[in-house]
Amino acid sequence: MSAQAAAAAASDAIEAAAFVDFYAAAPPTLAAQLGLRTAEVAAATLLFAPRLPATIFNRAIGLGVHRPANEADLDAVIAAFGEAGQGTLAYWIHANPFAAPANLAQWLESRGFTLPERRTWAKMLRGTAPPPDIPTSLEVRRARPAEVSAVAQTIATAFGMAPMLVPWIEAIFGRPRWRGYAVLADGKVVGGGALFVDGQDAWLGLGSVATEFRNRGGQGALMALRIRDAIAAGCTRIATETGEPVANEPNPSLANMVRCGFGKACSRLNYAAPGN
């Protein structure tokens, strides 16, 4: 396996591990209400939320990445989503460009899968080089227990999530491998983010700042702080991801990642199931 293929595989594995633990954190009542669960099928990680119509929560990560896939593997993944959603679930199967075999995308297309407008995610990875110091007029630090609810609400609002998901976000900050962060303006929570630490691997996610407080360095400083904390925790591989720009649209998230020392492991295709 080439170094680039190994980086792409690592970025998928780290993301998958973070989301498996994220799903495990869901309050039982909410998990039952939304049908939240994960499964491993054909060495891929499957995320299910059949009563939450958003592809970010219904997708397959890593098919053909950790071992070569065959058409029976692909059909098993499709069948699992079909069973979960009674044939109507909108979901994605991610196609890593280093997945095997090379014609995985052709198999998907022959089964009616298509690429949405945002065709790819930039899978980003970095090592232990210190991040830059990014000046900000906001306060950025670890979230205190009394701030966790406000941080979760701010994150949910920034990502357009339903209010019912706020307790789910809150729940991850009480788990051993998760750390929560707050962005504040004059003592008020206006943003936040999460760091998942899994041995020598780390994942950054849920980073957000309320619209009216953007362009003040908060997002960059939040990313840099989480990177420093991951390195201090002994992590040697730090992963994150973002949707790649469509046409010439700006992508401040991607710009901040590059600024903070992330390199692109790969551009991963998002194949939407037929009818999405």
PLM regions with names:
Residues P68-E139, A143-R144, T240, V246, ...:
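Acyl-donor-binding surface of acyltransferase catalytic domains
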Residues G160-E212:
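A conserved beta-strand-loop-helix scaffold within acyl/acetyltransferase catalytic domains
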Residues M1-G82, A100:
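N-terminal charged segments
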Residues M1-A26, I61, R67, R118-P167:
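Short amphipathic alpha-helix that is part of the acyltransferase structural core
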Residues R51-H66, Q200-T211, N270:
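Conserved acetyl-CoA binding element of GNAT-fold acetyltransferases
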Residues R37-A42, A100-T114, R177-G191:
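Conserved beta-hairpin
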Residues Q86, W178, A233-C235:
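Short, high-confidence coil segments that cap the C-terminus of an alpha-helix
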Residues N70-I78, L206-V209, N215-A232, A255, ...:
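Conserved acetyl-CoA-binding loop-helix of GNAT-fold acetyltransferases
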